[in-house]
């Protein structure tokens, strides 16, 4: 009786993108192409490239914070700061829910967890191209969520913010949301004015997508 030989050829377990993930990737490419971008990771200027890399680290910090503390965490991007308008669309912070004496999260009672960063000079968060769901493309998705005030903030950080949120398991509450930044200029005489794109910066955009599991 012949002994049956089993095929021991290792089977690759690597999985490709799911259909949903592919749709999201295509959506982000559409957004960045509309913005004049030439790549997903800011292949234009060094300022945009470094801004994307540093911001990704803040998103990872917020996600890990949410998991470790079992409390919601948010990445904030300044929309309209009361005392430092020159940092609008450039100041990025990380906040999380406070914990009570038993180590449990106090719902919607936020505290600053990181001083975050300022985007590089002449680099700004793009309200136009950052979307709540990148799979819907430039026109089909709603804007990023907003936080009208930052409770208990020091004077430097008072104002309104855009935000991306992670739940207690580190899952992004707006899966497929895109984060896009680009080069621009703002009139020195009006620091709170909306930045504008200059001719040399039309292709200088970059960004990433926040997947459902919180990774970028």
Regions found by a protein language model. Name each.
Residues 27-28:
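Residues within membrane-spanning alpha-helices of integral membrane proteins
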